[in-house]
Protein backbone atom coordinates (compact mmCIF):
# COMPACT_ATOMS: atom_id res chain seq x y z
CA UNK A 1 0.00 0.00 0.00
CA UNK A 2 1.43 3.48 -0.87
CA UNK A 3 2.62 5.75 1.89
CA UNK A 4 1.62 9.37 2.39
CA UNK A 5 4.31 12.02 2.91
CA UNK A 6 3.46 15.06 5.05
CA UNK A 7 5.32 18.10 3.69
CA UNK A 8 4.89 20.05 6.91
CA UNK A 9 6.27 17.36 9.21
CA UNK A 10 8.76 15.75 6.74
CA UNK A 11 7.53 12.27 7.67
CA UNK A 12 5.92 9.33 5.88
CA UNK A 13 2.65 8.09 7.36
CA UNK A 14 2.25 4.33 7.81
CA UNK A 15 -0.19 4.13 4.89
CA UNK A 16 -2.36 6.37 2.73
CA UNK A 17 -5.88 6.26 4.12
CA UNK A 18 -8.34 8.91 5.24
CA UNK A 19 -8.34 7.75 8.85
CA UNK A 20 -4.53 7.88 9.13
CA UNK A 21 -4.36 11.30 7.46
CA UNK A 22 -7.13 12.65 9.66
CA UNK A 23 -5.47 11.41 12.82
CA UNK A 24 -2.12 12.89 11.75
CA UNK A 25 -3.58 16.25 10.67
CA UNK A 26 -5.36 16.72 14.00
CA UNK A 27 -2.22 15.98 16.04
CA UNK A 28 -0.53 18.83 17.93
CA UNK A 29 2.89 18.27 16.30
CA UNK A 30 1.40 18.58 12.81
CA UNK A 31 -0.58 21.71 13.75
CA UNK A 32 2.51 23.32 15.28
CA UNK A 33 4.56 22.48 12.15
CA UNK A 34 1.91 24.03 9.90
CA UNK A 35 1.90 27.27 11.92
CA UNK A 36 5.71 27.42 11.91
CA UNK A 37 5.84 26.78 8.16
CA UNK A 38 3.50 29.66 7.32
CA UNK A 39 5.15 32.03 9.80
CA UNK A 40 8.53 31.32 8.22
CA UNK A 41 7.14 31.90 4.73
CA UNK A 42 5.42 35.06 5.95
CA UNK A 43 8.66 36.62 7.21
CA UNK A 44 10.66 35.64 4.13
CA UNK A 45 8.06 36.58 1.54
CA UNK A 46 6.60 39.67 3.20
CA UNK A 47 9.29 41.99 1.88
CA UNK A 48 9.07 40.59 -1.66
CA UNK A 49 5.27 40.99 -1.64
CA UNK A 50 5.60 44.58 -0.41
CA UNK A 51 8.19 45.33 -3.10
CA UNK A 52 5.99 43.89 -5.86
CA UNK A 53 2.98 45.93 -4.70
CA UNK A 54 4.93 49.18 -4.51
CA UNK A 55 6.51 48.59 -7.92
CA UNK A 56 3.07 47.95 -9.47
CA UNK A 57 1.74 51.18 -7.94
CA UNK A 58 4.81 53.07 -9.16
CA UNK A 59 4.37 51.66 -12.68
CA UNK A 60 0.66 52.56 -12.63
CA UNK A 61 1.43 56.11 -11.49
CA UNK A 62 3.97 56.55 -14.29
CA UNK A 63 1.47 55.27 -16.84
CA UNK A 64 -1.09 57.91 -15.82
CA UNK A 65 1.52 60.66 -15.99
CA UNK A 66 2.12 59.90 -19.70
CA UNK A 67 0.65 62.87 -21.62
CA UNK A 68 0.24 60.77 -24.79
CA UNK A 69 -2.37 58.42 -23.32
CA UNK A 70 -6.00 59.20 -24.33
CA UNK A 71 -7.26 59.69 -20.75
CA UNK A 72 -4.69 62.47 -20.25
CA UNK A 73 -5.65 64.49 -23.34
CA UNK A 74 -7.12 67.96 -22.73
CA UNK A 75 -10.89 68.14 -22.84
CA UNK A 76 -11.29 64.50 -21.88
CA UNK A 77 -13.16 64.60 -18.63
CA UNK A 78 -16.42 62.92 -17.87
CA UNK A 79 -18.51 61.47 -20.70
CA UNK A 80 -21.32 63.70 -21.96
CA UNK A 81 -24.59 63.50 -20.02
CA UNK A 82 -27.30 61.25 -21.44
CA UNK A 83 -29.68 63.01 -23.77
CA UNK A 84 -32.93 64.30 -22.37
CA UNK A 85 -31.61 65.63 -19.06
CA UNK A 86 -29.31 68.61 -18.58
CA UNK A 87 -26.48 67.54 -16.34
CA UNK A 88 -27.48 63.88 -16.63
CA UNK A 89 -29.70 63.88 -13.52
CA UNK A 90 -33.32 62.88 -14.18
CA UNK A 91 -35.96 64.97 -12.41
CA UNK A 92 -38.22 63.39 -9.79
CA UNK A 93 -41.64 62.16 -10.79
CA UNK A 94 -44.23 64.92 -10.88
CA UNK A 95 -46.20 65.24 -7.68
CA UNK A 96 -43.80 63.17 -5.58
CA UNK A 97 -43.84 64.58 -2.05
CA UNK A 98 -40.52 65.33 -0.41
CA UNK A 99 -38.50 65.28 -3.61
CA UNK A 100 -36.26 68.32 -3.82
CA UNK A 101 -35.10 69.17 -7.34
CA UNK A 102 -32.59 66.63 -8.59
CA UNK A 103 -33.15 64.19 -5.72
CA UNK A 104 -35.59 61.44 -4.86
CA UNK A 105 -37.46 60.99 -1.59
CA UNK A 106 -35.79 58.76 0.95
CA UNK A 107 -36.48 55.10 0.33
CA UNK A 108 -37.40 55.66 -3.32
CA UNK A 109 -35.04 54.28 -5.99
CA UNK A 110 -34.37 56.42 -9.05
CA UNK A 111 -36.44 55.54 -12.10
CA UNK A 112 -35.04 52.98 -14.51
CA UNK A 113 -33.59 54.34 -17.72
CA UNK A 114 -32.49 57.90 -18.20
CA UNK A 115 -28.85 56.92 -17.88
CA UNK A 116 -26.19 55.24 -19.96
CA UNK A 117 -27.74 56.61 -23.14
CA UNK A 118 -31.21 55.14 -22.51
CA UNK A 119 -34.27 57.35 -22.95
CA UNK A 120 -36.00 58.36 -19.72
CA UNK A 121 -39.05 56.49 -18.50
CA UNK A 122 -42.31 58.42 -18.85
CA UNK A 123 -43.81 59.72 -15.60
CA UNK A 124 -46.60 57.80 -13.89
CA UNK A 125 -50.06 58.79 -15.13
CA UNK A 126 -51.87 61.04 -12.69
CA UNK A 127 -54.63 59.65 -10.51
CA UNK A 128 -58.27 60.76 -10.57
CA UNK A 129 -58.83 64.53 -10.82
CA UNK A 130 -55.13 65.07 -11.62
CA UNK A 131 -53.99 63.88 -8.18
CA UNK A 132 -50.63 62.08 -7.89
CA UNK A 133 -50.66 58.30 -7.51
CA UNK A 134 -50.49 57.27 -3.81
CA UNK A 135 -47.29 55.39 -2.84
CA UNK A 136 -47.08 51.69 -1.95
CA UNK A 137 -50.43 50.80 -3.57
CA UNK A 138 -52.47 52.68 -0.95
CA UNK A 139 -56.07 53.53 -1.91
CA UNK A 140 -56.94 57.01 -3.10
CA UNK A 141 -58.26 59.25 -0.32
CA UNK A 142 -61.97 60.08 -0.53
CA UNK A 143 -62.76 63.37 -2.29
CA UNK A 144 -63.66 66.45 -0.31
CA UNK A 145 -61.83 65.41 2.86
CA UNK A 146 -64.42 62.77 3.80
CA UNK A 147 -63.18 59.98 6.11
CA UNK A 148 -62.45 56.50 4.81
CA UNK A 149 -65.46 54.13 4.93
CA UNK A 150 -65.30 51.49 7.68
CA UNK A 151 -63.81 48.11 6.73
CA UNK A 152 -66.30 45.82 5.01
CA UNK A 153 -68.52 48.69 3.86
CA UNK A 154 -69.14 49.09 0.12
CA UNK A 155 -66.29 51.07 -1.39
CA UNK A 156 -63.92 50.32 1.50
CA UNK A 157 -60.44 49.08 0.58
CA UNK A 158 -60.50 45.30 0.34
CA UNK A 159 -64.31 45.11 0.26
CA UNK A 160 -65.82 42.93 -2.50
CA UNK A 161 -66.42 44.95 -5.60
CA UNK A 162 -63.95 47.68 -4.62
CA UNK A 163 -61.13 48.33 -7.02
CA UNK A 164 -58.10 46.44 -5.79
CA UNK A 165 -60.21 44.37 -3.39
CA UNK A 166 -60.92 40.67 -3.50
CA UNK A 167 -62.90 39.60 -6.55
CA UNK A 168 -66.43 38.36 -5.97
CA UNK A 169 -66.86 34.57 -5.93
CA UNK A 170 -67.56 32.86 -9.23
CA UNK A 171 -71.22 31.91 -9.60
CA UNK A 172 -72.38 28.40 -10.32
CA UNK A 173 -69.43 26.33 -9.14
CA UNK A 174 -70.50 22.67 -9.00
CA UNK A 175 -71.31 21.40 -5.52
CA UNK A 176 -71.43 24.90 -4.01
CA UNK A 177 -74.57 26.47 -2.50
CA UNK A 178 -75.96 29.67 -4.02
CA UNK A 179 -74.30 32.92 -2.86
CA UNK A 180 -75.45 34.02 0.59
CA UNK A 181 -76.49 30.54 1.72
CA UNK A 182 -74.44 28.03 3.66
CA UNK A 183 -74.14 24.31 3.20
CA UNK A 184 -77.07 22.19 4.39
CA UNK A 185 -76.68 20.41 7.76
CA UNK A 186 -74.12 17.65 7.47
CA UNK A 187 -71.73 19.62 5.26
CA UNK A 188 -71.22 19.61 1.53
CA UNK A 189 -72.42 16.66 -0.53
CA UNK A 190 -70.05 13.68 -0.38
CA UNK A 191 -68.28 15.00 2.74
CA UNK A 192 -68.60 13.22 6.08
CA UNK A 193 -68.10 15.37 9.18
CA UNK A 194 -65.28 14.37 11.56
CA UNK A 195 -66.18 11.45 13.81
CA UNK A 196 -68.68 9.98 11.37
CA UNK A 197 -67.73 6.73 9.73
CA UNK A 198 -68.47 5.61 6.22
CA UNK A 199 -72.18 5.15 5.44
CA UNK A 200 -73.50 1.81 6.69
CA UNK A 201 -70.82 1.43 9.37
CA UNK A 202 -71.55 2.14 13.00
CA UNK A 203 -69.07 3.19 15.62
CA UNK A 204 -68.66 0.79 18.52
UniProtKB/Swiss-Prot annotation:
Localisation per UniProt entry: Nucleus
Keyword match Nucleus: yes
Chain ranges of zinc fingers (Matrin-type): 4-36
Keywords on record: Metal-binding, Nucleus, Ribonucleoprotein, RNA-binding, Zinc, Zinc-finger
Location of region: Disordered: 65-204
Pro residues bias (residue ranges): 77-154, 166-192
UniProt-listed InterPro entries: Matrin/U1-C_Znf_C2H2, Matrin/U1-like-C_Znf_C2H2, U1-CZ_Znf_C2H2, U1_snRNP-C, Znf_C2H2_sf
PROSITE patterns: ZF_MATRIN
Main location, first listed in the record: nucleus
GO cellular component: commitment complex; U1 snRNP; U2-type prespliceosome
GO biological process: mRNA 5'-splice site recognition; spliceosomal snRNP assembly
Record carries keyword Lipid metabolism: no
GO MF assignments: mRNA binding; pre-mRNA 5'-splice site binding; U1 snRNA binding; zinc ion binding
Protein family: Belongs to the U1 small nuclear ribonucleoprotein C family.
Free-text function comment from the UniProt entry: Component of the spliceosomal U1 snRNP, which is essential for recognition of the pre-mRNA 5' splice-site and the subsequent assembly of the spliceosome. U1-C is directly involved in initial 5' splice-site recognition for both constitutive and regulated alternative splicing. The interaction with the 5' splice-site seems to precede base-pairing between the pre-mRNA and the U1 snRNA. Stimulates commitment or early (E) complex formation by stabilizing the base pairing of the 5' end of the U1 snRNA and the 5' splice-site region.
Subunit (UniProt): U1 snRNP is composed of the 7 core Sm proteins B/B', D1, D2, D3, E, F and G that assemble in a heptameric protein ring on the Sm site of the small nuclear RNA to form the core snRNP, and at least 3 U1 snRNP-specific proteins U1-70K, U1-A and U1-C. U1-C interacts with U1 snRNA and the 5' splice-site region of the pre-mRNA.
Protein name: U1 small nuclear ribonucleoprotein C
Organism of origin: Fusarium vanettenii (strain ATCC MYA-4622 / CBS 123669 / FGSC 9596 / NRRL 45880 / 77-13-4) (Fusarium solani subsp. pisi)
Lineage: Eukaryota, Fungi, Dikarya, Ascomycota, Pezizomycotina
Amino acid sequence: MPKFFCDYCDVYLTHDSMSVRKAHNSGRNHLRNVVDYYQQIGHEKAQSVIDSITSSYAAEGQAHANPMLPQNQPGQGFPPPPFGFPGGIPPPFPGMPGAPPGQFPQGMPPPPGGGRGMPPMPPFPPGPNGMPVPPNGLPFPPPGGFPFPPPGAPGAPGAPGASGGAPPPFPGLPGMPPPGQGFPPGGPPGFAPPGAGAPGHEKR
